[in-house]
Amino acid sequence: MAEEVPVINPEEWKPRTKVGQLVKEGKITSMKEIFEKNYPITEPEIVDVLLPKLKYEVMDIKIVQKQTDAGEISKYKVLIVMGNMDGYVSYGTGKAKQLRVAIQKAIKNAKMNIIPVRRGCGSWECTCGEAHSLPFKVYGKAGSVEVLLMPAPKGTGLVVGPALKTLLTYAGIKDAWSLTRGSTYTTENFIKAGYNALYNTYKFVTPVDWMRRK
């Protein structure tokens, strides 16, 4: 179930980095500028200011144990997916003794991992020209899991696994097919492989991009 991502009060934010200072001063006004100039997202508050209407969903909760001199220490490990359902998506993990704190850490981690997703109408079966699917095939890998995402005609829906469906929904993709290999039952690697595939939509340079740069 989607939850609103908590954000800080911009007036109380004291930037610790150059990029944060530029955002605070209003010299950077969008996430698009951040990625176009290859600036790193080193403070979660940057995302709070530039993408304030994010939502997240808890995908997995595990109890992990660590052996210490005092014995075994148990912690919650939380995996979340985050996005604005309009071209930006992320995932994050967090560990803590309390579940609430683990979720907070996962949200912070996800803000640092936010990426842009290029959408389009890349299926030869569809000529609507709307940004409802992917512009081309993209591949991603994490651990033993491999994911190939493919454009689908409008109205097809997301013909993918449940975890991948959530990730694509939060990215704002409505129609897609997928091929997967490996241990897809490991939710974290499955989502990470899908995330890596989506990131490749942005890294791939199309002829249209070359025209824009001239």
From Swiss-Prot:
Listed GO MF terms: rRNA binding; structural constituent of ribosome
SUPFAM superfamilies the UniProt entry points to: dsRNA-binding domain-like (SSF54768), Ribosomal protein S5 domain 2-like (SSF54211)
GO terms of biological process kind: translation
Residues in S5 DRBM domain copies: 54-117
InterPro entries recorded: Ribosomal_Su5_D2-typ_SF, Ribosomal_uS5, Ribosomal_uS5_arc, Ribosomal_uS5_C, Ribosomal_uS5_euk/arc, Ribosomal_uS5_N, Ribosomal_uS5_N_CS, Ribsml_uS5_D2-typ_fold_subgr
Organism superkingdom: Archaea
Record's keyword terms, sorted: Ribonucleoprotein, Ribosomal protein, RNA-binding, rRNA-binding
Gene3D superfamilies, sorted: 3.30.160.20, 3.30.230.10
Signal sequence coordinates: none
Matching Pfam families: Ribosomal_S5, Ribosomal_S5_C
Family listed: Belongs to the universal ribosomal protein uS5 family.
PANTHER family xrefs: 40S RIBOSOMAL PROTEIN S2 (PTHR13718:SF4), RIBOSOMAL S SUBUNIT (PTHR13718)
Domain notes: The N-terminal domain interacts with the head of the 30S subunit; the C-terminal domain interacts with the body and contacts protein S4. The interaction surface between S4 and S5 is involved in control of translational fidelity.
NCBIfam families from the UniProt entry: PRK04044.1, uS5_euk_arch
Record function comment: With S4 and S12 plays an important role in translational accuracy.
Record text on subunit structure and interactions: Part of the 30S ribosomal subunit. Contacts protein S4.
Name this polypeptide is given: Small ribosomal subunit protein uS5
Organism per entry: Sulfurisphaera tokodaii (strain DSM 16993 / JCM 10545 / NBRC 100140 / 7)
Lineage: Archaea, Thermoproteota, Thermoprotei, Sulfolobales, Sulfolobaceae
